[in-house]
Amino acid sequence: MKADESLEQIFKVQAGKLEESYARLKQVMPSYFFKSVSTEDLAAILPMAAELENKSGIQMIERPDRILMVYLKSETCNPVCTSRFFAGKRILRSIIHESAPLDGSGGIIVIEQITKDVPGPEMKPLFSSGQIEAEYRKFYERLPENLKETAESICWRDVEDLDLERIAKRLRLVCEVRKRDYSLTEIENVGGNEYRITMAVAVVARSEGYYAQTLEQLEASGFKVTRSYLRNFTAGGAPDDFRRKAVRVNTYYIVPVKPGADAPEKMINLKRELNELAWSPQFDLFERELLVRNEFCCASVNLLRAASEFVHSQLSFVDRNAYSLPEIQRFMATYPAVLRRLADAFESKFHPDGPSLDFGKAIQEVREEIANINSGMAEKDAKVKVVLSSVTDFICCILKSNYYSEKKTALAFGLDPAFMRHYESISESYGKAFPPERPYGVFFFWRRNVSGFQIRFSEIARGGWRTVAPKPVKSLLESGDSFEQARSELFRECFVLANTQHKKNKDIYEGGSKLVTLLKVTGEFDFKTELWAAQRAVFEAFLQLVNYGADGKLRDGKIVDFTNRADIIEIGPDENMSDEMISWMGDRAGEDGYTLGSGVISGKVDTGINHKHYGVTSFGVFQYLLRTLQYLKINPAHDDFSIKLSGGPYGDVAGNMIKLLNAEDGTGGYRMPGLRIVAVTDGPAAIFDPAGIDRRELSRLVHSANLDSFDPAKLRGEGAFMIFNQPDGDSRYPMASVSGGKLRRAMIARDDFMRMFQANICHEADVFIPCGGRPQTINAGNYGLYAPDGKPSSKAIVEGANSFITPEARLALQKLGVVIVKDSSANKCGVITSSYEILSGLLLDKNEFSAIHPKLVVEIMDRLAFCARREAEWLFHEFELRRSVPMTELSDQLADRINEYKQQLFTMLDSHPELVTDGVIFAHLPPLFRKKFADRLHRIPPVYRKAIAAVELSLRIVFRKKLSLEEDVRQIVSSIG
């Protein structure tokens, strides 16, 4: 009886607590709470809400389809904090209820109802595409071209509670976001002081953490969220279907909690802030210290994040250990007042409506404030001053930015290259890290997990776009090492490649440039999806800064431009650039009215000259190889000789080089019957065979598979081996080798694998042709491995890959007797092809280009052979005359001389426009244009005509006896007619 009485008493007490809990909620919770909560949920909420003051933390119940939370609001318990719980969960909707202040304590009860997005069967469409179209027409005059296909991809299970009108209105945002890469936000007043925010974002742009970040931004802007709905509105197509992306539509109902938070100007800024969340980092130091603690806006925080990344890219060449990115960001966040003044100065200078403060005065005050920093720790203060002064210099060197653009996918900055002087003043080591020439222009790009540079050395310039995406390793302790190394080298890699490209471009009217982006692979999506999303985002941002109208002004009126010039940029394909992306970029530039239209990028499959298909780069390298063999007194048609390669059969340059080396003579034999390819080093595998790697097996893989698909059973020579970059769970790597005439297999340790992999290019051969691999693979610190005991492992190197060998290593190897044909000479034919492709696009319509494509390719290949052989003959002739001058130096001298003439003539022709004749232009073009399209030269922009004349005349001057410059030009023009 006593037990029963005790239980009855417990039940009575608990029932009383539930009644008290209900009575209190009835008193303090908004009426909407009781309308929206089910009896089942209320039964779960009441016990959690009872005596809440005596409970710590968050009371939570999680069910398969929902989550319920009850807590007293505090700094550590609030909707922003709880939203982080959902980073790995699929949430369909969230309703947040806040009570009135409690009597006595003033505390606020928060009750959250979270509905999970539980997988279920597909629903039949609630409305037909015809019904949706008819409803859409009620509100909007113009139908999006993709409305029907977008309506047909609606995820009906996620929108079943929406009526036809709301579906139609949301489709206006969804249709635009689906084919572009920015997010769109609309803010509407729905009565009183309540607002509805509708945000459409491509799922590929953000997944985990987006909801939490949105709540955090809204709180920082002075609002609280009362309820939210998160819907997967449309399903997406394949990863390469860039115009049919899955789109999520999130809706938030908010009310201001800070006076003036909903002022018109602040609501405009809020819209821009929310749009930026799709590509902003989450939960980092700047978010905590600047956005949350110091109430910076998201746009300002992103500006400062970009600044920290840029400063790190430069200070890496001052002292890499002292100025790591975390240290730079820590030093910056320690002085929020300085950062706010810098952000305010930047925002004033680039505000579309004009400045609101004196930029020069503001910067001077910031510099004085930095100079007066004194924490009592002199060594630390010195570093802080370097970092903050570098951030200040970055702000001062910005000439244009898409910061105020409403529809952006990344931050883009056009910079004054004078920023390099700032770092040279800090340390001499900075200047020594780069070639002596300084760029004409620099662009910098930044977004979540992506940063990059585009550097050019002349007004009109072209060069490839490569994306560096270090592959994460399994070891947690080492997973970020390769990325951090690439991050520290990003600016130098781009600079050196652009400088090399400038020397390489001596045969064409464009100077040299390079675009290099660094992607941090997260694994959140598959690699191609992450890669393509990053490339699209950077391209969209880049296009905003170079897309000028006929009036010479940027088409985006939100961008203030201090360059006083209309930049024209040309891009070419490079590492990690796919045909799908090339086509998309060309189409996008054409849609937005870019000066060159689809000519912004070369290498398009349908309207271009695909480098990989025609092997144009390798074709040029091959011409230099033939001349090198001649110098070595090797007749490839009869003599035995050996070659080693870096790069694999699937790649452009290496694959096509293998194709040329293994070309047959028409009778079943090889044109080079005595050739042995003794070593090939590719990312997935490396092979060494002293008897020569099986040529037919190697040819089988060309452009169809990577080197790891080579059949190890084809290894022949004693000591031959093949190692695979396929580690198991114990970091051991597969190896096949020939020993005692038998093929043996084993697993080797990582250290042994790396030693063999790195040393594979050091096996003896007559000629080494690097056709792939990372820049600076052979450098001042390791060139001795290539030449053990001072004996080089090859007689010559023909550089098919850019910057594979550092300048210091080149000189050291040449002193040991290695003949090196520099990259800027050897692999220039790819960019020559791209230049002709762009000119063809200007002169011809698409159907005309297609009609003459086969004949045009033949004429361009003839031109490539002429350009390569002419320079090769000049180099070897000069090399034999001037033995004391390394061939790489001769290559630089030739490029510098031609480029110097190009610049002089480009300027001189302003005063002598009569020298820019049609005859000179036609002399530079393939003969087909004079024969069939002689009336098209007016399509070439005047500045391009002048540049074409400058390069054609420069080449003819350099390769003939020199008179006075003007006399030489007049004689050449006269001879051309």
Where are these regions (language model features)?
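Low-complexity, serine/threonine/proline-enriched polar segments
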Residues: 133-150, 527, 540-550, 699-743
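Hydrophobic, well-ordered beta-alpha structural blocks that scaffold small-molecule cofactor pockets
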Residues: 599-697, 701
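Glycine/serine-rich phosphate-binding loop and adjoining beta1-alpha1 elements at the start
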Residues: 494-641, 681
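Flexible, glycine/charged-enriched surface loops at secondary-structure junctions
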Residues: 226-230, 285, 318-322, 504-510, ...
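Non-transmembrane, aqueous-exposed alpha-helical and coiled segments at domain scale
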Residues: 496, 525, 626-644, 667-675, ...
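Conserved phosphate/anionic-ligand binding catalytic regions in large, soluble enzymes, centered on
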Residues: 298-306, 310, 415-419, 437-464, ...
